[in-house]
Regions:
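Conserved beta-strand hairpin/beta-sheet module of binuclear metal-dependent hydrolase folds
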Residues: 5-52, 166-181
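Metallo-beta-lactamase
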Residues: 7-8, 35-36, 40-44, 96-225
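Divalent metal-coordination and catalytic microenvironments
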Residues: 11, 29, 39, 54, ...
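A short catalytic or substrate-binding loop motif that flags glycine-/basic-rich loops and adjacent residues
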Residues: 19-21, 137, 158-162
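Active-site metal-binding motif and surrounding structural segment of the metallo-beta-lactamase
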Residues: 45-91, 204-210
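Short amphipathic alpha-helical segments
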Residues: 49, 77-80, 99-100, 190, ...
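Short, acidic/turn-prone active-site loops that include or flank metal/cofactor-
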Residues: 89-94, 182
Length: 228
């Protein structure tokens, strides 16, 4: 079954993951004033497919996209999103490093495309351009955004996966997006269990019924905590 736009609560939808192309779950929060996406996806093609699904459900395009962490499959669609992007300042720091590497190394894009079969599939062997950009707004502290009838809380967390984890909590719907925060460090997948324990404590204290991660499924909160 291909990617689908699933409604999981009154205001929240999830555009489901696609493992062969390493496309993560993308979130969508529909407010009466504006809507927000969670993560920008793997490429402009990923964004286009997501937006097509929104339009098929008569949902407006997001005015804001929050980024859960810097990895390419969550950020390399940023240049193609509608409206503005928002991320932790650590996320922009990592993306700035990628842009510097691209400028210094003419072979960077070729190396990236050949680093994994899922990346080659997503970028159609180079027919789609790789275009990293920085987020429009950097967060140095947590923030709540009133979308109209629903709130998006942008929360910081320790994570064994990256040092820039951003959680997105929708308190009215008791939904929490965590990106890849519970995974080990890429590419070794080494697990820092102290950070994992701190992440679990952070998730436990948030009032949520459903937790949406990056590449798996939609968890009941207790189900995820038992895995951690």
């Amino acid at each position: 079954m291909g990617q689908q736009l699933k409604k999981i609560s009154d205001h929240v939808w999830v555009y489901t993951f696609d493992s062969p192309k390493d496309r993560p779950n993308l979130g969508y929060i529909h407010g009466s004033r504006m809507s927000m996406a969670v993560d920008a996806g793997h490429s402009s093609s990923h964004v286009a497919d997501f937006y097509r699904a929104l339009e098929e459900h008569d949902l407006p395009l997001p005015a804001l996209t929050a980024i859960t962490h810097w990895h390419w499959d969550h950020t390399f669609g940023m240049h193609a999103v509608n409206g503005k992007t928002i991320a932790r300042f650590e996320t922009n720091r990592e993306l700035a490093g990628i842009l510097a590497e691209m400028k210094a190394n003419p072979m960077w894009e070729s190396t990236f495309l050949n680093s994994d079969p899922s990346i080659r599939r997503e970028y159609q062997n180079g027919r789609i351009r790789v275009v990293p950009v920085l987020a429009d707004e950097e967060l140095r502290q947590e923030k709540s955004i009133d979308l109209g009838s629903v709130t998006a809380r942008l929360l910081f967390a320790d994570s064994p996966h990256t040092d820039d984890a951003l959680l997105v909590h929708v308190p009215e719907d008791r939904v929490l997006f965590i990106g890849d925060a519970q995974l080990g460090q890429f590419p070794s997948w080494r697990m820092d269990y102290d950070k994992l324990d701190r992440l679990a404590r952070r998730i436990r204290e948030i009032d949520a019924e459903f937790v949406v991660d990056g590449h798996r499924h939609i968890y009941r909160k207790q189900e995820l905590l038992e895995e951690l």
